């Protein structure tokens, strides 16, 4: 047996060897740090026995997959601790996630004191150092095992597996769980962990199922790494849009209205309107024409597009096909509507490309368990567009769509925070898609070549394409590390035929156009959440709901403050006057907490000279200035959408 290691070196063995034995053969230090193995790209237990030629990488907690194994084992230790302290608790699932791990239990909610007690029990379990053993059972025996244990959620999971399947289990001491693995060799490998919070979660993410209690935690290989992560989590909490957005009166949610249906408050509307005007003006400069299409349509439209067969579960359907004459659905996207705008007229090859833009309100029937602030909602607004092009125009127009997206990211100051993904079809799951394999391979090849020509680093994600075409997804992580798609640009060589779209070529013949589906900035709600977290609420001045606050030092300067305010408003500056009878220090602190970028302090000297004293969050005290000079500077900053660097800390201002 020849084992090829990550560095290309090879080891030859006359007999089968376990991954951990090979790790020791390489280095005792590596073996001690090992969490799992990676055989031909697949993570496996260290106890896995190899008996044929393969490629092997020993995974440690420094590797993403290795850290996931450590965290997965930590979730099992958590579950064992909970059932030790709360014997009536039923276990559901407990995976590793990007930021740690969680486990779901059917039991009453946990308090912070409960979590502290569970942590202590986990430490006891780890100190005992039980080895982790893997074994298998038949499907029938596994069902019987969990029925005897009175674990209904595990029974359901096993029952969903195919007949004849071999079911894997992991045990640590006298506690056993259903699990595909891999896991550490011993619970002793969980050296640094922390239980973070407890919340509610529906079983399998569906509100139709039981509400469970979820415990979140995280784990690292060392206490220093854990400490660093916890400090980052504190900063994340400070920036979390779901908390900060409410504090800043940007949005709120109300139970009686429903999950995933945020109310955008006046401050949030100001930001969204600024973004919308900017995007629409930019699209107009780039040759887009605007449409306004209905929020719903008959099911017939979605049957033509294929959404009825491939996306119906994600739509809000109004009516019953069996009893109602007409069934409608709220639109989950704008594309089929804009196709009929195109079809309303005949087009020649000279008319193309046609670029349609629309600020669209869309509806998607997401599970309740997926709802979160502004990032996962059921109704949202999006800068949607569709380009109808000749095949020979496709590459240039697609690149131009990427350029528009990059321009938007650059203006918002987030171009360094995103990753690019080529989302491809899954040839092993063809029923999910329309079109022939050769069309998919060709279109994916075009996108791959474009990204390479543009020197854009990207990853390829199988199975992430829409049902009618591959796409470029531009993703960003929130403050907790969860990745969301911000912008999508999609190649579609198929739906023009579904809708019988054509143009007349130079020979007078009908030809099928290609279609580009794209967003320039993406979903406004998600972008707003992203910006709140990126800037901790301290938006660039052009986006700030309140750009200037005038602060008179006493009541006798209210009239002058009002004159300053009036002049600011005449010049389009969003401002207010703080006329409260409070100490100056308090009013200045309040303006900082409201994240107002500029304060204009006015008193006797300023009134006498017709000036203002400027304090900014960028430089602190900027001195006394002519109001006209301040106006010229802030108007230029707003016009250019400048992102000023904060040079001084709040406490030094």
Where in the sequence are the language-model features?
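NTP/phosphate- and nucleic-acid-binding module
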Residues: 1-90, 97-653
């Amino acid at each position: 047996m020849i084992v090829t290691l990550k560095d290309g070196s090879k080891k030859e063995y006359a007999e089968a060897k376990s991954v951990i034995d090979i790790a020791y053969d390489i280095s005792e230090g590596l073996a001690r740090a090992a969490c799992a193995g990676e055989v031909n790209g697949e993570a496996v237990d260290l106890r896995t026995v190899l008996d044929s030629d393969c490629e092997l990488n020993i995974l440690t907690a420094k590797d993403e997959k290795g850290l996931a194994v450590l965290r997965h084992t930590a979730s099992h230790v958590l579950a064992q601790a909970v059932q030790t302290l709360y014997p009536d608790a039923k276990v559901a699932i407990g995976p590793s996630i990007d930021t740690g791990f969680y486990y779901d239990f059917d039991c009453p909610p946990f308090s912070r004191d409960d979590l502290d007690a569970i942590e202590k029990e986990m430490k006891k379990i780890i100190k005992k150092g039980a080895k982790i053993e893997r074994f298998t059972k038949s499907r029938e025996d596994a069902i019987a095992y969990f029925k005897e244990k009175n674990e209904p959620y595990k029974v359901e999971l096993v029952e969903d597996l195919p007949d004849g399947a071999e079911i894997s289990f992991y045990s640590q001491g006298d506690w056993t769980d259903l699990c595909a693995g891999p896991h550490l060799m011993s619970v002793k490998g969980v050296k640094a962990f922390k239980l973070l919070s407890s919340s509610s979660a529906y079983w399998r993410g569906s509100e139709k199922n039981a509400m469970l209690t979820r415990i979140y935690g995280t784990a690292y290989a060392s206490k220093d790494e854990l400490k660093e992560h916890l400090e980052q989590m504190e900063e994340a909490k400070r920036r979390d849009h779901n908390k900060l957005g409410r504090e800043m009166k940007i949005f709120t949610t109300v139970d009686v209205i429903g999950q995933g249906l945020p109310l955008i408050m006046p401050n949030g509307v100001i930001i969204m309107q600024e973004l919308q005007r900017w995007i629409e003006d930019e699209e107009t400069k780039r040759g887009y024409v605007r449409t306004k299409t209905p929020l719903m349509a008959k099911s017939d439209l979605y049957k033509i597009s294929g959404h009825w067969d491939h996306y119906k579960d994600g739509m809000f359907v109004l009516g019953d096909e069996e009893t109602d004459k007409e069934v409608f659905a709220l639109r989950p996207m704008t594309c089929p509507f804009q196709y009929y705008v195109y079809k309303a007229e005949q087009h020649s090859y000279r008319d193309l490309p046609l670029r349609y833009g629309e600020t669209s309100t869309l509806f998607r029937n997401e599970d309740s368990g997926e709802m979160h602030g502004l990032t996962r909602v059921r109704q949202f607004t999006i800068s949607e567009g569709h380009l109808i092009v000749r095949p020979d125009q496709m590459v240039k127009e697609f690149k131009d769509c990427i350029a528009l997206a990059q321009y938007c990211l650059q203006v918002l100051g987030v171009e360094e925070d995103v990753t690019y993904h080529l989302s491809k079809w899954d040839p092993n799951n063809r029923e999910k898609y329309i079109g022939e394999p050769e069309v998919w391979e060709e279109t994916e090849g075009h996108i791959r070549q474009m990204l390479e020509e543009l020197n854009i680093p990207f990853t390829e994600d199988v199975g992430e394409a829409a049902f009618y075409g591959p796409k470029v997804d531009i993703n960003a992580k929130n403050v907790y590390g969860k990745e969301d798609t911000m912008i999508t640009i999609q190649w579609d060589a198929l739906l023009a035929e579904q809708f019988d779209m054509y143009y007349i070529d130079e020979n007078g013949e009908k030809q099928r156009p290609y279609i580009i589906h794209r967003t320039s900035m993406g979903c406004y709600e998600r972008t707003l959440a992203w910006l709140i977290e990126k800037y901790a609420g301290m938006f660039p001045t052009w986006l700030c709901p309140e750009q200037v606050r005038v602060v008179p030092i006493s009541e006798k300067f209210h009239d002058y403050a009002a004159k300053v305010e009036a002049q600011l408003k005449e010049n389009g500056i969003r401002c207010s006057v703080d006329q409260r009878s409070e100490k100056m220090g308090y009013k200045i602190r309040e303006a900082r907490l409201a994240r107002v970028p500029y304060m204009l302090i006015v008193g006797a000297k300023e009134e006498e000279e017709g000036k203002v004293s400027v304090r900014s969050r960028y430089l602190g005290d900027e001195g006394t200035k002519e109001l006209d000079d301040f106006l010229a500077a802030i108007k230029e900053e707003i016009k250019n959408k400048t992102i000023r660097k904060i040079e001084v800390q709040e406490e030094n201002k």
